[in-house]
A protein has these predicted regions:
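An amphipathic, hydrophobic-aromatic interaction surface with interspersed Lys/Arg
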Residues: 1-78, 83-85, 132-229
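Intrinsically disordered, low-complexity coil segments
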Residues: 69-77, 97, 109-117, 234-236
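Extracellular-facing segments of soluble proteins and assemblies that are Gly/Ser/Thr-biased and enriched
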Residues: 83-160
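Alpha-helical oligomerization segments
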Residues: 202-268
Length: 268
């Protein structure tokens, strides 16, 4: 179910969103490390899952994968925990508590006749209200959480093999390997914005991403404009042709096939 224009507008403004009776908040920079831990539970390419799981609502598929792995005596992958952790971040459930305590806030409810089928997850909000989210509801909430926090999801019709090929091509053309440390991005944006790093920690993650992309575009445009004036040419065209708009990427290269999300975490 696609999100509405009003929700998209709220996401761009870094506002909270009401959905399914719940309030979803933009995740803040101060929780970036936890966000990155939970991210594979949201941005996985579901089409890359085995067919039996690919056709299920994502949360139900995660539960079924974990159940089947335990039945075989194998190590579980952890995607269900990642998805629930992302939900906790978005709801600000258990904020400030250790990760294991935040995850313990959720209770999985299953079909009484088929214990491998997840029917809902339950949790207590504000210390008193019992809430229930079904896998179908999570499908919709996932779209909002992604939009609020700068995650680009793969469309259902996407070819997972093509997505993986595009990602690998982007990595090959990406030049030097970067550290990817979150604090480095925060420190750089703080310097460019003439702000304290502690101030930026209170920003929504999407705001940090937007500011970083904007500064990258400004500096890239200035550098390439000077280079073009000196006769420089690029095989695939100027990478920064506009001061105001990003160059359109060929395909979504930010998506995670299941093999990447589960690498080093056992097999499902």
């Amino acid at each position: 179910m696609p999100i509405s224009q009003s929700i998209e507008r709220a996401c761009r403004r870094y506002e909270e969103v009401q959905a399914e009776g719940l309030t979803l908040y933009p995740i803040l920079v101060e929780e970036m490390e936890t966000f990155e831990l939970a991210r594979p539970g949201i941005d996985i390419v579901q089409q890359s899952l085995p067919v039996a799981y690919a056709v299920m609502p994502l949360l139900a598929a995660y539960y079924k994968m974990e159940y089947d792995a335990m039945e075989r005596g194998e190590e579980t992958v952890g995607l269900l925990s990642m998805a629930l952790l992302m939900l906790a971040l978005s709801l600000r459930l258990g904020r400030g508590k250790p990760l294991d305590e935040r995850l313990k806030a959720f209770r999985c409810k299953v079909d009484t006749k088929d214990p491998s089928r997840l029917t809902a997850v339950e949790f207590v909000l504000h210390g008193e209200e019992l809430w229930r989210i079904t896998p179908v509801q999570f499908q919709y909430l996932r779209e909002i959480i992604a939009a609020q926090n700068g995650i680009e999801l793969t469309p259902p019709e996407a070819n997972p093999e093509l997505v993986e090929a595009q990602r690998e091509l982007a990595e090959m053309n990406g030049g030097a390997k970067l550290s990817g440390e979150a604090w480095e991005r925060v420190a750089t944006v703080a310097a460019l914005e003439h702000a304290e790093e502690t101030e930026i920690e209170s920003w929504p993650l999407l705001k940090l991403q937007t500011k970083a992309k904007t500064w990258q575009r400004i500096l890239g445009y200035m550098t390439c404009t000077i280079a073009e004036a000196r006769g420089t040419q690029w095989k695939r065209g100027n990478p920064w042709p506009s001061l105001f708009y990003d160059r359109v990427s060929e395909g979504n290269t930010a998506l995670r096939p299941v093999e990447e999300s589960t690498r080093g975490m056992g097999q499902a």
